[in-house]
Amino acid sequence: MRLIPLNRAEQVGAWSAQHIVNRINAFNPTADRPFVLGLPTGGTPLNTYKKLIELHKAGEVSFKNVVTFNMDEYVGLPADHPESYRTFMHENFFNHIDIQPENINLLNGNAEDHEAECQRYEDKIKSYGRINLFMGGVGNDGHIAFNEPASSLSSRTRIKTLTEDTRIANSRFFGGDMNLVPEYSLTIGVGTLLDSEEIMILITGHNKGLALQAAVEGSVNHLWTVSALQLHPKSVIVCDEPSTQELKVKTVKYFQQLEAKNMEGF
């Protein structure tokens, strides 16, 4: 596992965006051989999306031959609801780049048959072989996507009940009213994530400190979903200084020295 310990959240956004651009350009995707990118929602990746849009407008990257799969979606929230993840992705990213609409893949939280919808999503991912790079965030309790604590580390795309902590955290997007936050979601599984060629997780803010500690210094534990990254051959965590407060000083220094050249310019 790699750890990129930067100073500020803005640097996390810049580094992660450049990493995605580098991966896409090195892959040199075509219509018949697209680059497959997994994407999250939430506050943490906003800096990354802003930087990706900036790099796209500067001619540094094209998303014409990029296929995307989003991590999750609320169940029962209308697709055009301002807090649906479909709306989030279009407003904050898709509407500002040259991605082809048919290459955007989002879970349908209003499907009549949730199990069939989840299987459709898994099958669609497999039709491309695998996801080349999956970017994600992490919750205070270490959840990735909506894989809450105690999720199976071999789980696939499925419907999940949201914990009270997650609903309270997400209530900030619903006027502070937890009762307006849906109780269920469709989410990729931990196993789905681990099937990706590469995983990049963004962690910012002091409130994510325990999750980062569990990911880097803890043991693999289904109560900390993020610890599953230790099982992946090509995972990278990009974090800011406030999120490292629970890590040992020598751990941070080790990765600062190890990744010094890769952090130059950020």
Curated annotation (Swiss-Prot):
<feature type="site" description="Part of the allosteric site">
    <location>
        <position position="161"/>
    </location>
</feature>
<comment type="pathway">
    <text>Amino-sugar metabolism; N-acetylneuraminate degradation; D-fructose 6-phosphate from N-acetylneuraminate: step 5/5.</text>
</comment>
<feature type="site" description="Part of the allosteric site">
    <location>
        <position position="254"/>
    </location>
</feature>
<comment type="similarity">
    <text>Belongs to the glucosamine/galactosamine-6-phosphate isomerase family. NagB subfamily.</text>
</comment>
<keyword id="KW-0119">Carbohydrate metabolism</keyword>
<dbReference type="InterPro" id="IPR004547">
    <property type="entry name" value="Glucosamine6P_isomerase"/>
</dbReference>
<dbReference type="GO" id="GO:0004342">
    <property type="term" value="F:glucosamine-6-phosphate deaminase activity"/>
</dbReference>
<dbReference type="GO" id="GO:0006043">
    <property type="term" value="P:glucosamine catabolic process"/>
</dbReference>
<protein>
    <recommendedName>
        <fullName>Glucosamine-6-phosphate deaminase</fullName>
        <ecNumber>3.5.99.6</ecNumber>
    </recommendedName>
</protein>
<feature type="active site" description="Proton acceptor; for ring-opening step">
    <location>
        <position position="143"/>
    </location>
</feature>
<comment type="subunit">
    <text>Homohexamer.</text>
</comment>
<keyword id="KW-0378">Hydrolase</keyword>
<dbReference type="GO" id="GO:0019262">
    <property type="term" value="P:N-acetylneuraminate catabolic process"/>
</dbReference>
<feature type="site" description="Part of the allosteric site">
    <location>
        <position position="158"/>
    </location>
</feature>
<feature type="site" description="Part of the allosteric site">
    <location>
        <position position="151"/>
    </location>
</feature>
<feature type="active site" description="For ring-opening step">
    <location>
        <position position="141"/>
    </location>
</feature>
<dbReference type="Pfam" id="PF01182">
    <property type="entry name" value="Glucosamine_iso"/>
</dbReference>
<dbReference type="InterPro" id="IPR037171">
    <property type="entry name" value="NagB/RpiA_transferase-like"/>
</dbReference>
<dbReference type="GO" id="GO:0042802">
    <property type="term" value="F:identical protein binding"/>
</dbReference>
<feature type="active site" description="Proton acceptor; for enolization step">
    <location>
        <position position="72"/>
    </location>
</feature>
<comment type="function">
    <text>Catalyzes the reversible isomerization-deamination of glucosamine 6-phosphate (GlcN6P) to form fructose 6-phosphate (Fru6P) and ammonium ion.</text>
</comment>
<dbReference type="GO" id="GO:0006046">
    <property type="term" value="P:N-acetylglucosamine catabolic process"/>
</dbReference>
<feature type="active site" description="For ring-opening step">
    <location>
        <position position="148"/>
    </location>
</feature>
<dbReference type="InterPro" id="IPR006148">
    <property type="entry name" value="Glc/Gal-6P_isomerase"/>
</dbReference>
<keyword id="KW-0021">Allosteric enzyme</keyword>
<dbReference type="InterPro" id="IPR018321">
    <property type="entry name" value="Glucosamine6P_isomerase_CS"/>
</dbReference>
<dbReference type="GO" id="GO:0005975">
    <property type="term" value="P:carbohydrate metabolic process"/>
</dbReference>
<feature type="site" description="Part of the allosteric site">
    <location>
        <position position="160"/>
    </location>
</feature>
<dbReference type="GO" id="GO:0005737">
    <property type="term" value="C:cytoplasm"/>
</dbReference>
